[in-house]
């Protein structure tokens, strides 16, 4: 079910934790090679309602990363506390790597400009995350997700012709998403942060 339906967050979370040991090790290694990544591992920040105040984000200047993140959460009716905690990864460091990946998912949506209101939007993000992280759950979701009956033929064609090539290109050239301390960039213009990350947001095609 998790392969076809990225909305089943419980099953997606379980699949992510029970697969991908080697990918998590590589993610941890890449974080340890980067000064910001090391700081994130040391401080282990979480993205929860008590750590990131959406009311404060809503009050930020238009066009800032924090304001756009709050808008994304509001527009999609999302809850910061809905992300499951990691349960099936025993190693403390590797468990946090998985948790951080999960916690920043909505930051990734915000920065890439990809919607979460459709299965197709989640599939496009999974392609980007697959290239960035190598996690099997992202790979499987990328491959099998388009077979979901909720993905319309039009969206399937748009994935093939634009969003998947966009995800592959940006996934390879963009800064490693795990090595960005997003919480320190809320007051920065979102386009400035994208530039620092070498990330080009996806265009919104018709129907997205």
UniProtKB/Swiss-Prot annotation:
Keywords on record: Lyase, Membrane, Metal-binding, Mitochondrion, Mitochondrion inner membrane, Ubiquinone biosynthesis, Zinc
InterPro entries assigned: Coq4 (IPR007715), Coq4_euk (IPR027540)
Main subcellular location: mitochondrion
Function field: Lyase that catalyzes the C1-decarboxylation of 4-hydroxy-3-methoxy-5-(all-trans-polyprenyl)benzoic acid into 2-methoxy-6-(all-trans-polyprenyl)phenol during ubiquinone biosynthesis.
Miscellaneous comment: This protein may be expected to contain an N-terminal transit peptide but none has been predicted.
Description of how the protein assembles with itself and partners: Component of a multi-subunit COQ enzyme complex.
Similarity section: Belongs to the COQ4 family.
Name of this protein: Ubiquinone biosynthesis protein COQ4 homolog, mitochondrial
Source organism of this protein record: Nematostella vectensis
């Amino acid at each position: 079910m998790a392969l076809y339906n990225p909305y089943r967050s419980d099953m997606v979370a379980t699949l992510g934790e029970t697969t991908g040991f080697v990918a998590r090790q590589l993610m941890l290694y890449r974080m340890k090679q980067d000064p910001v990544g090391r700081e994130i591992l040391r401080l282990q920040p979480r993205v929860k309602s008590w750590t990131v105040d959406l009311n404060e984000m809503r009050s930020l200047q238009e066009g800032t990363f924090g304001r756009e993140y709050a808008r994304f959460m509001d527009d999609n009716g999302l809850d910061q506390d809905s992300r499951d905690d990691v349960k099936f990864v025993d190693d403390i460091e590797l468990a946090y790597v998985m948790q951080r990946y999960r916690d920043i998912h909505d930051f990734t949506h915000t920065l890439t400009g990809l919607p979460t209101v459709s299965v197709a939007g989640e599939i496009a993000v999974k392609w980007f995350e697959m290239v960035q992280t190598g996690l099997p759950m992202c790979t499987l979701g990328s491959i099998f997700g388009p077979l979901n009956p909720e993905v319309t033929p039009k969206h399937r064609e748009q994935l093939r012709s634009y969003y998947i090539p966009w995800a592959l290109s940006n996934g390879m050239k963009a800064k490693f998403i795990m090595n960005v301390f997003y919480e320190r960039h809320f007051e920065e213009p979102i386009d400035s942060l994208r530039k620092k990350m070498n990330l080009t947001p996806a265009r919104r095609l018709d129907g997205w």
